[in-house]
């Protein structure tokens, strides 16, 4: 079925160069619009040999959807699919960068990446071992109102330790904090921080397990890719030439490290489109990801702000309710709870 852009989608598709930030509501057709834009840039931009339009998204399912749709639009223009563009997840992109020059990240050529199942088992072993050797210490974390539930909490103690440690390790890696650095910071702090010490003990055991296997985990890929890009300017210049256009999906869930990687790849003169919905950020509660990176990008000098406000996914009543909830957060009597950020109102649309 031919793609007929809505007026707001057409505004996005007018992009030719520079930087653009797009706030897109659910059901606004952002994937289709971004896919069409990628194909349009492949067909109409003056790409040289070895250059590609890079589409970056968050998860594998979205990457597959983008690859299919961009391929369809490219074929409609009489071009061969899979030429002139690349679709990657952020972690897939980081893996490409590290695999190409592992020495820059301090790795050997044959390094392994543990999948989520293996890293989950490694973390569980480290956390459960710590919990067994600190079997009664959970009571130190209970307030008086929870003492009656101490027995139940004790039964759940190993899993509570594991979940807490997983969050600790995730955030430590996002902030590029190695166990040795954290240990020195804790010593310098002076006061006892039992929860931080627990997380650090398990972090150290987890990292020992990775080193024993000669492996890294998916969380390592982002920081190692950043290390590689910062270590070799010539390598970074080659990648900037390779990807003169970068289109970023789900930008509301970008972390500081992820944004730094893409900023480096874009450089001073590159072309960058970021699309996302700040109201749909799902990773900020348990990672360092934040929709503020997208909001602040849209406010930057020279960035073209655009919206995709037309939703074809929900009935008008549902959209009115969602908009009212957003208005309520803007007017909340507690100033600390007000949503005072860039957000888009959804507009019902029967056009798909």
Which residues fall in each region the model found?
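A short helix-to-beta-strand connector/capping loop
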Residues: 78-85, 301-304, 348-352
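Conserved coupling/interface region of RecA-like P-loop/ASCE motor cores
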Residues: 60, 280-349
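Short helix/loop segment immediately N-terminal to the Walker
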Residues: 137-150, 231, 235-242, 332-347
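Alpha-helical scaffold elements adjacent to nucleotide-binding pockets in ATP/GTP-utilizing enzyme cores
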Residues: 37, 65-73, 93-100, 118, ...
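P-loop NTPase Walker
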Residues: 1-107, 237, 320-323
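ATP-hydrolysis module of ASCE/P-loop NTPase motor domains
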Residues: 103-201, 305-311, 332
């Amino acid at each position: 079925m031919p793609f007929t852009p809505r007026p707001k989608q057409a505004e996005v598709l007018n992009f030719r160069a520079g930087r653009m930030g797009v706030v897109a509501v659910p059901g606004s057709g952002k994937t289709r619009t971004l896919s069409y834009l990628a194909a349009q840039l492949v067909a109409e931009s003056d790409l040289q040999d070895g250059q590609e339009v890079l589409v970056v998204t968050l998860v594998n399912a979205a990457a597959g959807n983008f690859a299919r749709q961009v391929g369809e639009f490219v074929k409609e223009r009489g071009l061969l699919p899979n030429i002139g563009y690349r679709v990657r997840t952020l972690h897939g992109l980081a893996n490409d960068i590290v695999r190409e020059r592992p020495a820059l990240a301090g790795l050997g050529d044959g390094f392994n990446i543990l999948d989520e199942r293996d890293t989950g088992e490694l973390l569980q072993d480290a956390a459960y071992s710590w919990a067994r050797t600190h079997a009664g210490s959970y009571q130190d974390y209970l307030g008086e109102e929870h003492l009656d539930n101490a027995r139940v909490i004790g039964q759940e103690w190993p899993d509570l330790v594991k979940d807490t440690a997983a969050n600790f390790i995730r955030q430590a890696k996002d902030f590029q904090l190695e166990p040795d650095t954290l240990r020195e910071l804790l010593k310098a702090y002076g006061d006892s921080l039992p929860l931080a010490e627990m997380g650090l003990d398990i972090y150290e055991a987890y990292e020992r397990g990775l080193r024993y296997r000669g492996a890294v985990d998916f969380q390592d890929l982002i920081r190692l890719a950043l290390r590689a890009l910062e270590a070799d300017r010539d390598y970074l210049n080659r990648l900037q030439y390779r990807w003169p256009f970068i289109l970023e999906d789900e930008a509301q869930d970008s972390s500081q490290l992820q944004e730094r990687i893409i900023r480096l790849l874009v450089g001073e003169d590159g072309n960058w489109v970021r699309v996302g919905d700040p109201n749909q950020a799902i990773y900020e509660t348990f990672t360092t990801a934040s929709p503020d990176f997208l909001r602040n990008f849209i406010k930057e000098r020279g960035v073209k702000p655009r919206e995709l406000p037309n939703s074809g996914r929900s009935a008008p009543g549902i959209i009115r309710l969602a908009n009212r909830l957003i208005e309520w957060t803007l007017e909340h009597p507690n100033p600390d709870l007000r949503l005072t950020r860039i957000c888009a109102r959804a507009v019902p649309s029967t056009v798909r």
